[in-house]
Swiss-Prot record:
UniProt protein name: Ubiquitin carboxyl-terminal hydrolase 39
Record-stated family: Belongs to the peptidase C19 family.
Subunit structure: The U4/U6-U5 tri-snRNP complex is a building block of the precatalytic spliceosome (spliceosome B complex). Component of the U4/U6-U5 tri-snRNP complex composed of the U4, U6 and U5 snRNAs and at least PRPF3, PRPF4, PRPF6, PRPF8, PRPF31, SNRNP200, TXNL4A, SNRNP40, SNRPB, SNRPD1, SNRPD2, SNRPD3, SNRPE, SNRPF, SNRPG, DDX23, CD2BP2, PPIH, SNU13, EFTUD2, SART1 and USP39, plus LSM2, LSM3, LSM4, LSM5, LSM6, LSM7 and LSM8.
InterPro entries xref list: Papain-like_cys_pep_sf, Peptidase_C19_UCH, Ub_carboxyl-term_hydrolase, USP39, USP_dom, Znf_RING/FYVE/PHD, Znf_UBP
GO cellular component entries: nucleus; spliceosomal complex; U4/U6 x U5 tri-snRNP complex
Pfam families: UCH, zf-UBP
Gene name tied to this protein: USP39
Key words of the record: Cell cycle, Cell division, Hydrolase, Isopeptide bond, Metal-binding, mRNA processing, mRNA splicing, Nucleus, Phosphoprotein, Spliceosome, Ubl conjugation, Ubl conjugation pathway, Zinc, Zinc-finger
Amino acid sequence: MSGRSKRESRGSTRGKRESESRGSSGRVKRERDREREPEAASSRGSPVRVKREFEPASAREAPASVVPFVRVKREREVDEDSEPEREVRAKNGRVDSEDRRSRHCPYLDTINRSVLDFDFEKLCSISPSHVNAYACLVCGKYFQGRGLKSHAYIHSVQFSHHVFLNLHTLKFYCLPDNYEIIDSSLEDITYVLKPTFTKQQIANLDKQAKLSRAYDGTTYLPGIVGLNNIKANDYANAVLQALSNVPPLRNYFLEEDNYKNIKRPPGDIMFLLVQRFGELMRKLWNPRNFKAHVSPHEMLQAVVLCSKKTFQITKQGDGVDFLSWFLNALHSALGGTKKKKKTIVTDVFQGSMRIFTKKLPHPDLPAEEKEQLLHNDEYQETMVESTFMYLTLDLPTAPLYKDEKEQLIIPQVPLFNILAKFNGITEKEYKTYKENFLKRFQLTKLPPYLIFCIKRFTKNNFFVEKNPTIVNFPITNVDLREYLSEEVQAVHENTTYDLIANIVHDGKPSEGSYRIHVLHHGTGKWYELQDLQVTDILPQMITLSEAYIQIWKRRDNDETNQQGA
């Protein structure tokens, strides 16, 4: 080998050794940098919150370029309260420091209770999502999430609104610092969002006449508060107000434990009606409300969904149709059936009657042929037992002619005259497309709360006509004993009823409005409610209205004895 080639060989060997030395020192340096990375990240205030010994092996073995993505994802996933998250923070020694911040949050004075309204759907104001919804307690808006890049987090940074309430867990948080706030001064907000009642409080509701004061200073009686008319839902408002003043039904829904464990088939949406009605009852009777009215927005959305848009918020509906559908839907959603299984709805409102039906020959037939047909079995009177939720009372036909002053005559009829339909003697003819029938009705069981629906609207081929006849009725002491047969009278000790709710329809059939008169049991006074307006009214004025739906309460033994004394 020549001298030149020997020198080149020694040079190449030396170069390899230097490159290997540089490569190994580079690897050592990179490993040292990787070991220092958590310390450097914590000193820079990085969002990394979990020490490396708690990271999965995949995260430890990942290249340095992937680690920041893992951190961001981990931070965004830590959103809801969970025990594993708290355990990890405890191992890191962060629980004590967070507890100190939780109990001494500096932003509690920024909460604005006057803008808080929990009556509307728990929906993010930016993304249409119900999941993980938070309410900003500074401006009252709803946002989704509280992790990094969530709408609530961005809102807190952009507008310096720091206090948020989880609308499902009822926990308070400070953002963007992301720690839970624990303070007893926030209990009033939690109670407005989800009112609760003890058995003792429920038992005393009808014995108290104490006024409550809202946050804005207005006073109100719990249970006698206005319902917001979103557009054309006053027909539903009146019915819901009436049902909220029926004590057994109200008491059942004020206590959520009575119905929350009822099992329904998978995918059943009807139970939503029960949940929303219970929430509305608790809000109407909340003595610690921030305002003296309630919005039935969530309740009506459930009605629209469960009725398949038969009843809507934006279109006027019929109060009797809505009442009939709502009571039957509520009964079904609570697990009731038509014949056997009972619910609170049937216990309160369901009565029974005998219906006697007799088919009539066609009026155009000769008299001899009619006489022969009446001897056939088909034309003999039949009787069936039937249950009812309400009684329909028929009004006499309104006059077509005007008086001498060119004004329409508004007739009047006593309540007992139209109740004669159910005395078991009075017959009424009913016509179908092909056949005519004579029917008579006799009551066999009177419910604790009796609903009268006065039939004011009749439909023909062209339009709906309203009967303006005024029904004269007493406010108290309506005895229905004479409408029962003798054997049924022996079973019923009390047959005397007092009025507790009176729904009125004013105006034309398609353009009219609804209002309601309700009795407050604690004060013994009557109040008129029309949407948000609440005024007291004299009992004598109630009888002058065009009553459409009435709810009567049967007296018990104690009340009857007091009246007799």
